[in-house]
Amino acid sequence: MGPQKLLNLIGNTPLMETVNLVKNKNVKLLLKLEGNNPGGSVKDRAAYNMIAAALERGDIKKGDKLIEATSGNTGIALAMIAQLFQIEIELVLPEDSTKERTQTMRAYGATVILTPASEGIIGSRDYADKKVAQGGYLMLNQFANDDNWKAHYKTTGPEIWNDTEGTVTHFVSAMGTTGTIIGTSTYLKEKNKNIQIIGAQPSDGSQIPGIRKWPQEYLPKIFDASKVDTVVDVSEEEAREMTKRLALEEGIFAGMSSGGSVAVALKIAEKLESGVIVAVICDRGDRYLSSDLFD
């Protein structure tokens, strides 16, 4: 394969078989390595699809200014792709987001607005909504944009199906905007309705960057409960521990949301006699080096 343009490098990420985490040799645990996307996370897929579709429809025009609330990875992906299309963008995120994330967004030319940490991503969403209501901004709104989940219907789902040669039995994904799990589920269920779709969310009181147990009034509009067979709570401690185990036992340096997903996947693996479980590794661990995750 010869040289590729950056946007053509989004997707087709590796699917890696773990070798140490699962003791039952009749159960395969496969990791979808989304940190291999050019922007470093699974969010490259949705960001590209949302911007490209909006441009094609004429929803975004030259000179427009975008604003978006994000916990980090979507913001980085949007900043990267917006600059390719020469679109101005402001990104709103909680002030306790890691320095690596905010600096990366600024490196891509985005304006970064920080909202109080105590308000979390909900505070960032409220701020962005108010700015749009005041005029002068357009919002892609990843939480309500069908082009978010459709990115995974078009790419992530088919990749998993093809790479497992149709043998996948379980799919596990952390739930933030829920675009990854809804889009991938929609495709996989069309191929085999018996594939189990499992969402990972933080247990009460746990803080896991990138995923959230949403209050009903803030539940992403793209979420479709019929597409998810089971939602499993994972504690912050479990997610931290598994994130460290991924690095030490499998050589995968990832963020805490990935640890949460794999912790849930491993619980499922321990109950199965046989199966093929695919879990999403959302991003890379280098986005969290200024936090205490790897202390």
Report residues per predicted region.
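PLP-dependent amino-acid enzyme catalytic core
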Residues: M1-D295
